[in-house]
Amino acid sequence: MTLPMTTFITQRTQQTITINGERYTASGAKISASDGKSLLQKKFYDLYGKDSFYSSLADFLAEWFDDSNTLKVHTSGSTGQPKELWVEKRKMMNSAILTISFLKLHQGDSAMLCMPLQYIAGKMVVVRSLVAGLNLIPIPPCGHPMQNLETPPVFSAMIPMQVFNSLQVPSERKLLMQIQHLIIGGGAIDDALGKALQEFPHAVWSTYGMTETLSHIALRRLNGSDHSDWYTPFDNVSLSLSEENTLTIHAPSVCSELLRTNDIAEFNQHGQFRILGRKDNTINTGGVKVQIEQVEKELKSLLNCPFMITSVPDPKFGERIVLLIEAVHINHEQINESIKKLPPYWRPKQIIRIDTLPLTDTGKPSRAVARQIASNYIDKT
């Protein structure tokens, strides 16, 4: 997409948004100075209730159309406390244009919004709809976003848990497979889910990005003849590795500063990359550095229940690997047999049963909470 076309699209559609086939103008979404609410807020508050997902959409649009050039977003908090960031609306539109251009979305295409609006992923679905003139289909965030739909959207962004759940219900699976442009982010895609996606007739993509990059700056194809383990960055994104082999991102159209991530990565000869894990998810046990994500990937095929790997301090080894298992009862003998198949330094030294694994609001493993759960358990024993 050339710059003149980009400018044209932005100016043409930024002042209107289509929701469930009904067009709303910026003036209707903007807060009135007289009563502190927009016409859209009043309508959605009355129809759906002040605490509804539709009302949160009206609140976001009121913020989008206010006089400020920035708005506040929150990180997911997967590795610690969520952070507040102020981001430029102009750069959010730049991010939207990257995705619209890459996927070749067109005015009038439907876009399902099934992500929480307090985080960047949900906000960017709305911004893409504004910029490209998409028909936004709001679905309150849940584990089965397809369950009440009669026709599939043209475009949707989902987390792995939503995709997995939808695949388990035949009617939802049928609709899911008809989505023409499906992007999946917010968590790892395991081998079983990746295999199931191979049957999809349309392109399915895994995204790489974060709040600081205003959603994704790279995609990798999950199905078809072009499927790959490697992410391809957008054209205006420059990537490199730090001395610690963590990914450094230079993407001036969406992020003003050089971004140093905690993601340990490697490149291939084509400039594509893949993520090996996070620096803050490295466990140093007995002088050997173990990557949590790699242990979890190996255990996926060995354990048939939800689990997480975490660690606790250990006076002998520095850190001790701990396995958290979500189950009513656990078969220690069976689990120990599975653990023996791991390399020696990868093997958890302790197994803890819990009722529910800690997740963030966006469905990511809450690593900080997992460590706290393990530490509290150890302290009590």
Where are these regions (language model features)?
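Conserved AMP-binding A3 loop
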Residues: N69-I97, K104
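AMP-binding/adenylate-forming catalytic core of the ANL superfamily
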Residues: I264-W346
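Conserved C-terminal "lid"/linker of ANL adenylate-forming enzymes
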Residues: I283, T310, V322-E326, E337-T381
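AMP-binding/adenylate-forming
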Residues: E88-N94, S110-N165
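Conserved pre-ATP/AMP-binding loop-to-beta segment of ANL
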Residues: S55-H74, Q107-G108
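Gly/Ser/Thr-rich phosphate-binding loop
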Residues: I9, V169-G224
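Conserved AMP-binding/adenylate-forming
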Residues: K195-V204, E212-Q272, K279-T282
